[in-house]
Amino acid sequence: WGRGIETYGEDPYLTSRMGVMVVKGLQGTNDGKYDKLHACAKHFAVHSGPEWNRHEFNAENIKPRDLYETYLPPFEALVKEGKVKEVMCAYNRFEGDPCCGSDRLLMQILRDEWGFDGIVLSDCGAIADFYRDNGHKTHPDAESASAAAVLSGTDLECGSSYEALVEAVKQGKIDEKAVDVAVKRLLTARFALGEMDEPEKVSWTGIPFSVVASAGHDSLALDMARKSMTLLMNKDNTLPLKRGGLTVAVMGPNANDSVMQWGNYNGMPPHTVTILDGIRKALGTDDRLIYEQGCGWVERAQIQSVFNRCKTADGKPGFSARYWNNVTRDGEPVTTAQVTTPFHFCTSGATVFAPGVNLTDFSATYNSVFTPDQSGEVVFDIYAYGSGRLRINGEEVRGFSNQHGGQKSAYTLQVQAGKTYDVELDFEYFRSDALLNFDLGFKNEVDVRKSVERVKDADIVVFVGGVSPNLEGEEMGVELPGFRG
């Protein structure tokens, strides 16, 4: 499943305990008149089918014991103990019915058994999955799908299928009074949050943006991270390590990777300390650090960046950039820039790609000339949330477009030393949180024996493995062994 990074683990009890505290922390306490925030429990329920067919997967023949002891306890705890205000229904089907149209899940279990009286909203596009050809195909059209979803208790849709509710009422597929039930829940929530009143009347609007990533919050996060770590084994009392003449080897594909620590559906932190950086900082002046990546995530290969072999037509290092405040590149660019390092652009946190460029509804074109100093296979590595295309010598060699978070895309080219290659990368984005990472490099096979030789004198080896958001993300296209995306 593409969003495993966001979960609290597979243990129903621990997930329940952590989830309840997160909900309480998010929602806070009512100030006497207004709620601070409404948290949402997701995705309800049995949402752990294969990523690649999530829009048509049917979770069936679930034994009652599995349902009530494995899949449902965290949701029940969030409703009964956490008093969560919202629940999101999942993409998949449950026992034949789409979760957002399941009376069993939304009416019998959630509302009748647990007493939930808040809002149920759909995952984005989930109602359209009822009738789309590449979805469940349980309903013939948007009118039937939207009527069924509302009647099953889905009050709010992330999407546009509910626009058909007017016609559904006219066709007699649903009574207007049933729609009124959902509308009442939605308006009740908005009144509770103070959305219908002047901002100055709502105490929560006085919280300044400056608290985000503030020194106090950073300190608390660090303290929480330290106190929440669990040491499972300490064979021969290896820990704590003693400084002074210590040689530490740090290995693994995630050792020097910031993105690995962010998860997915993440904000962009103002700074990140990689595990390699953290160990380096912790060592004393008499200690020695050896960094040897040693392997990739799933392949016996590493990418050695050759971004420094790229120059623009006028001889400047890196890529020239042109930006438009529209997605069609109409008119003259609003600004130009020179990008001298591998791309790490993201609009999260209201950070623009360049001064004067929109946060949404913008496009960009990057150009450079790549002149390799050796022959071999060069990988053009793209990780993007948005749409675009890569051209080499005027020919489009790779296109990309995605709707949910970052997507990894790559193109491999056999190059000759001294030959020039015109590189052009287009990018455009309509919504918020645009993301574009780009680099190029030679793909070198990992020689495990050489890596072992380089770290043989280390007193201890710290290996940092696991997966990464570069491998695992929602509806993320992955072209690597062992992953179907």
Question: Predicted regions span which residues?
Answer:
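Glycoside hydrolase catalytic-domain context in secreted enzymes
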Residues: 1-485
